[in-house]
């Protein structure tokens, strides 16, 4: 066999993570209500299927956009030809307006500062190529999306240094943890080029607070060579939009728009989570740095968004009545679905981190661990995947420093499937509790037997000792 390149054969792609292994097991045995009711239910996929009816209704009412027409006339030939790498201006304008609407119109976005990419994965990698050299490092708060080990590192050669967090403060970013991560990178002789956050957080399902954002901005203001990348692809999934604060708002509110910090803050966005369109492969980089925009535009030729996709979505996003209703209804449905999962888990004795965004919950299964170790977490995860038949993501795949946390997705299935998943989890919890009761009872019987034996031995020793003394006295 001919030897492939080092890049093709290296193990830095991150695909060996339990996050991806769970997907592989699901693909071998996918659940289907009629064809395979005993199959694995996919709860490791952050996909939003709750508002497809709204999108389908819009398509039915807007046949020109759906059939690639303009005023009843076909634009097929126009769309079939090569397009400028910058993208269709109509789509970029509509996308920029949608980003502003998604953030409560508290900030505005210039479409000239947008670079279109084939999804957020491509956007994040392109930013790494623009901002860092191989061997440089980015600081990431933990826990973080497992795919970042592939997206940020594999082809770019960039290293990730974790900013550790814990459940004691709800996994919030602290100044101390940020500084410790920076010092750790320096000890490893790594040149830190930036910080990357997901806001709202994947996997936590929480929005980054004003306090946390100020900590980050204070840090990059003090350290002049460090960038801040905010992956905001879940901005449209916040149950209450006022709870989400974009980094662009901090720039505005902290009066940093006329400082050098402006050019070191970048946003990654997409329509995969907000509109539930991951198959359309629409992402973007937003930056105020013209050099970043220029370089990223050149690199975008390796992952363009098709003209047909841009044409269709420019019409959809330009329909303000639709987008306003969609965002409101999407938030409502996500909130209701998240509540069903949380209440269902609480009913069987499992708690979740309090969340206000995302397509998943950060679930605390520490009470189900046989020991407080990552080995015990993996044992539990394997049992859930292979026996319970649910694909969920273990916290260790997200680089969580505490064993026993799991990411569980809830928006990629119908209500009946969620109910079945909860039923399966209940059986797991019942089995674990029953097993522990039996173990406890066995242990108590064993301890009782030992106490009885020791009591008999003590009595025998006492009698023997008494008779010895009696003989001596005689």
From Swiss-Prot:
Q: Where does substrate bind?
A: 47, 85
Query: Can you summarize the PTM annotation of this record?
Result: Ubiquitinated by XBAT32. Ubiquitination probably leads to its subsequent degradation, thus controlling ethylene production.
What inducers act on this gene? By indole-3-acetic acid (IAA) and cycloheximide (CHX). By auxin.
The record ties this protein, via Gene3D superfamilies, to: Aspartate Aminotransferase, domain 1, Type I PLP-dependent aspartate aminotransferase-like (Major domain)
Give the source species.
Arabidopsis thaliana (Mouse-ear cress)
GO molecular function per UniProt: 1-aminocyclopropane-1-carboxylate synthase activity; identical protein binding; pyridoxal phosphate binding
Cofactor section:
pyridoxal 5'-phosphate
According to UniProt, the name of this protein is: 1-aminocyclopropane-1-carboxylate synthase 4
Which key words are in the record?
Answer: Ethylene biosynthesis, Fruit ripening, Lyase, Pyridoxal phosphate, S-adenosyl-L-methionine, Ubl conjugation
The free-text tissue note of the record is: Expressed in roots, leaves and flowers.
State the family it belongs to. Answer: Belongs to the class-I pyridoxal-phosphate-dependent aminotransferase family.
Q: How does it assemble?
A: Homodimer and heterodimer. In vivo, the relevance of heterodimerization with other ACS enzymes is however unsure. Interacts with XBAT32. Interacts (via its C-terminal region) with ETO1 and EOL1.
Name its pathway.
Answer: Alkene biosynthesis; ethylene biosynthesis via S-adenosyl-L-methionine; ethylene from S-adenosyl-L-methionine: step 1/2
User: Which pH dependence is annotated?
Assistant: Optimum pH is 7.8.
Please report a single Pfam family linked to this protein. Aminotran_1_2
Superkingdom of this entry's organism? Eukaryota
Q: What does this protein do?
A: 1-aminocyclopropane-1-carboxylate synthase (ACS) enzymes catalyze the conversion of S-adenosyl-L-methionine (SAM) into 1-aminocyclopropane-1-carboxylate (ACC), a direct precursor of ethylene.
């Amino acid at each position: 066999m001919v030897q492939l390149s080092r890049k093709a054969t290296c193990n830095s792609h991150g695909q060996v993570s339990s996050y991806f292994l769970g997907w592989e097991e699901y693909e071998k045995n996918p659940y289907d209500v009629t064809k395979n009711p005993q199959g694995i239910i996919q709860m490791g996929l952050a996909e939003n299927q709750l508002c497809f009816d709204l999108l389908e209704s819009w398509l039915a009412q807007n046949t020109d956009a759906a059939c690639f027409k303009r005023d009843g006339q076909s634009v097929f030939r126009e769309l079939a030809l090569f397009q400028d790498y910058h993208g269709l201006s109509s789509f970029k304008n509509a996308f920029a307006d949608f980003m502003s609407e998604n953030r409560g119109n508290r900030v505005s976005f210039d479409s000239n500062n947008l670079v279109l990419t084939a999804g957020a994965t491509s956007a994040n990698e392109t930013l790494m190529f623009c901002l860092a050299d191989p061997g440089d490092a980015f600081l990431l708060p933990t826990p973080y999306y497992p795919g970042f080990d592939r997206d940020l590192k594999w082809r770019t050669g960039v290293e990730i240094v974790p900013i550790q967090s814990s459940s004691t403060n709800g996994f919030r970013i602290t100044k101390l943890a940020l500084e410790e991560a920076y010092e750790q990178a320096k000890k490893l002789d790594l040149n830190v080029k930036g910080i990357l956050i997901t806001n709202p957080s994947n996997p936590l399902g929480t929005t980054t607070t004003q306090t946390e954002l100020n900590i980050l901005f204070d840090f990059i203001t003090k350290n002049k060579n460090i960038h801040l990348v905010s992956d905001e692809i879940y901005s449209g999934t916040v149950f209450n939009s006022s709870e989400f604060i974009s980094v662009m708002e901090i720039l505005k509110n902290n009066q940093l728009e006329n400082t050098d910090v402006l050019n070191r803050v970048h946003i990654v966005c997409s329509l995969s989570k907000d509109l539930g369109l991951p198959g359309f492969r629409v992402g973007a980089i937003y930056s105020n740095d013209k050099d970043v925009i220029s370089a990223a535009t050149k690199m975008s030729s390796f992952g363009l968004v098709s003209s047909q996709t841009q044409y269709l979505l420019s019409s959809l996003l330009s329909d303000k009545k639709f987008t306003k209703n969609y965002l409101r209804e999407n938030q409502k449905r996500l909130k209701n679905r998240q509540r069903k999962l949380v209440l269902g888990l609480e009913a069987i004795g499992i708690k979740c981190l309090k969340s206000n965004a995302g397509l998943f919950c950060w679930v605390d299964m520490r009470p189900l661990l046989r020991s407080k170790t990552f080995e015990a977490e993996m044992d539990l995860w394997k049992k859930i995947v292979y026996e319970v038949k649910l694909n969920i993501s273990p916290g260790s795949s997200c680089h969580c420093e505490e064993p026993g946390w799991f990411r569980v997705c809830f928006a990629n299935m119908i209500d009946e499937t969620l109910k079945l998943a909860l039923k399966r989890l209940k059986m797991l919890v019942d089995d674990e509790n029953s097993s522990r009761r039996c173990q406890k009872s066995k242990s108590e019987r064993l301890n009782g037997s030992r106490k009885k034996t020791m009591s008999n031995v003590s009595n025998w020793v006492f009698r023997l000792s008494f008779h010895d003394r009696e003989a001596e006295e005689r």
